[in-house]
Amino acid sequence: MAAAYVLINTAPGKAGEARKQIGEIAGVKSAHAVTGAYDIIAYIEGGDVSELGNKVVSQIQSIDGIAQTMTSVVVELP
């Protein structure tokens, strides 16, 4: 299993609806509107890193109002 945080910037006025749509995607465990450099932070899970990448590119980035994403994959440290 792989997991990642997706940091998302939206067009002005689009964060609320985008967050709602992101939250409906299978594998998205949480999606929150936040203050700071990003508008939304989502936590996603999938079978592997490739699946996470496909989810970001084909499902999250295709939502109307999504301007930019940055994905940080969760790693297990000893």
Short names for language-model regions:
Residues M1-P78:
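A compositional/biophysical signature of low hydrophobicity enriched in polar/charged and small residues
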